[in-house]
A protein has these predicted regions:
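Carbohydrate-interacting regions of secretory-pathway proteins
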Residues: 1-283
Length: 283
């Protein structure tokens, strides 16, 4: 895990006691890409209620704990840094329950999204350390996909590589090929500690950012936003939308119960935990 105090050149963004410097926000839909047609699916009281649901964010045992509010409701949320950052390295410890779809977004707008998400999809057909563009054309860079192995009682006991030939597969040649670097799933499985704390690091640099991730010291993925082709992705338009600096937001995903993942995207009562959150600004 990350050290208890900031490494040289880094400073802490969370004191382990209160959520000072962070603001909860509702997880609301955003246009798929800058200028995309957009219509609220909710209206009236339902829309107002959605805007007010900012999730369940607590501090327990020195960690930020994020979950749905109420648990099992399928309603997601963000926890957004009050500060904005341009070029930086961010390191933190994470402990997601099995069957959570989490991660954190960088260079986001004040509502927690749009932004580029570093994935902590700790669920079937998920992945850790890849990327997804929330409102950034859905750009999806994923080096590998994971699943869990279970004991005879159905309890998850460890992580395995997901079946690449199943009906419902998110990993594809496309999601892997847009990465400048993609770790091998076997190397990842050697370093990941299932059910324990793991350390994730991201480096974000450049006006049109280049993103690099590490998990427990293993380099996972590199995505150069200048050098990719993706449907509806316009590097200049997205850089303009995000700005040279943006917020960091921790994510609790919502469930779409009509989607094939259903409850498996965020299991009722599941939480994700974050601690030892340190940043080093490079600009």
């Amino acid at each position: 895990s990350a050290p208890k105090s900031p490494p040289e050149g880094f400073r802490s963004l969370f004191d382990g006691k209160i959520l000072k410097g962070w603001k909860p926000a509702a997880r609301l839909p955003v246009p798929q890409y800058p200028g995309a047609p957009f219509k609220w699916r909710l209206e009236g009281e339902a829309l107002e209620a959605a805007k007010k649901n900012t999730g369940r964010w607590l501090v327990e045992n020195g960690a930020i704990v994020g979950g749905q509010e109420p648990p099992g409701s399928g309603k997601g949320a963000y926890l957004v840094s009050e500060e904005k950052f341009g070029d930086f390295e961010l390191i933190m410890d994470m402990k997601p329950d099995w069957k959570t779809d989490s991660g954190f977004l960088v260079r986001t707008l004040p509502g927690g999204s749009p932004g580029m998400q570093i994935l902590v999809d700790h669920r079937p057909q998920g992945g850790i350390g890849g990327f997804y563009g929330n409102g950034i054309a859905g750009v999806h860079g994923m080096p590998f996909a994971i699943d869990a192995e279970y004991d005879k009682k159905g309890n998850p006991i460890g992580m395995i590589a997901a079946n690449p030939d199943g009906d419902r597969v998110e990993l594809s040649k496309k999601t892997r090929s847009i990465l400048k670097y993609a770790a091998d799933v076997d190397d990842f499985l050697k370093v990941w500690k299932f059910g324990e704390w793991n350390t994730i690091k991201v480096r974000c640099e450049g006006r049109i950012p280049k993103l690099t991730t590490w998990v427990n010291g293993l380099k996972i993925a590199v995505l150069d936003m200048k050098a990719i082709e993706w449907e509806n992705y316009d590097a200049e338009a997205c850089a303009k939308l995000q700005g040279r600096k943006g917020h960091i937001s921790l994510e609790v995903h919502n469930n779409n119960f009509n989607h094939w993942l259903g409850k498996d995207r965020w299991w009722p009562g599941a939480v994700v935990r974050w601690k030892n959150i340190y940043i080093r600004e490079l600009d």
